[in-house]
Amino acid sequence: MTSHAANPKEEQDQRLPFKSDISGPIAPSQAPAHTVQAHDSQPKPSDDSSDEHLSFYEAKARIVRAFAASRAPQPAAPAAKALEGDASVIVPGKLILSSCEVEESSELLTKLGVTHILQVGEELKPSHPGRFTYLSLPILDMEGQDIVALLPSCFQFLQQAQASGGVCLVHCLAGISRSASVVIAYLMWTQGMPYTEARAMVRRARSKVYPNTGFTLQLQELDRLRESGAIQWGDTPSLASSLEQHRQPWNLIRYLEVKEKQAQEEGWTWGRTLVI
């Protein structure tokens, strides 16, 4: 997706009856030293075999999960030279954003000096588990998914990479929504940037960046809480604690429901303004 204009599909999704329940933050489980695998606390589609009982959210989640499960590893990654343009340098010598194809090319990873790889996607698995340090976090590219809950783990991993003098590659499937949202949030946290400035910086390096509507709203709300002082950035443990203390309805539908209720109670108009 390369357009920066509002996406009609996403606008339509906001009007449809999603159904979503979000649990607490995802905590990494015990895993081999080279790979940290997190538990999936995102909402699961119903096991009800009758499609007529599925909400829109459940039906969409079922399709997305089926696609994720069916994605087989590529028999051979494209040539490193052909992929160089897909490796977007966000912070020189520290942070790179890309699609999954860059991660599949050990030749290009070595050329880029990559030492750590942050995978943001349920369908993604390490291609070179013995050669690079991985953190793999399961999340779907859906508006109702809670990406804020992943941020403390992501930030800690990125800090560890930089403290060791390494270069971290952050990627999802296409390097457009999930991984881009994490990188934008990381710049907000480390550089003290507002959301719009961090997003603009990432887009200058990678013009195709386009977080889905739910992730955008979550990051905007996170920025608002940061500016108000409700959330203290601090170190990652402080951030995780602060996020838990000021728990928000991070997913899109609960966010809209809460804001509309607040508008009704306080007598102001909630226009669902979204900067994209």
Curated annotation (Swiss-Prot):
Query: Recorded GO terms, molecular function?
Result: JUN kinase phosphatase activity; protein serine/threonine phosphatase activity; protein tyrosine phosphatase activity
Q: Which domain of life is it from?
A: Eukaryota
| Keyword Hydrolase set for record | yes
**Induction of synthesis:** By oxidative stress.
Query: What's this protein's family per the entry?
Result: Belongs to the protein-tyrosine phosphatase family. Non-receptor class dual specificity subfamily.
| Region called Disordered, residue ranges | 1-52
UniProt-annotated stretches for the region Catalytic = 89-276
Gene name of the encoded protein: VH-PTP13
Cystines in this chain: none
Active site residues of this protein: C172 (phosphocysteine intermediate)
Question: E.C. number, please?
Answer: 3.1.3.16, 3.1.3.48
Q: Where is the composition biased (Basic and acidic residues)?
A: 7-18, 41-52
Tyrosine-protein phosphatase domain location is 86-228
Q: Which reaction does it catalyse?
A: O-phospho-L-tyrosyl-[protein] + H2O = L-tyrosyl-[protein] + phosphate; O-phospho-L-seryl-[protein] + H2O = L-seryl-[protein] + phosphate; O-phospho-L-threonyl-[protein] + H2O = L-threonyl-[protein] + phosphate
Q: Which UniProt keywords apply?
A: Hydrolase, Protein phosphatase, Stress response
Gene source species = Chlamydomonas moewusii
The protein's name in its UniProt record: Dual specificity protein phosphatase
State the function annotated in the UniProt record: Could be involved in tyrosine phosphatase signalling pathways, having MAP-kinases as substrates.
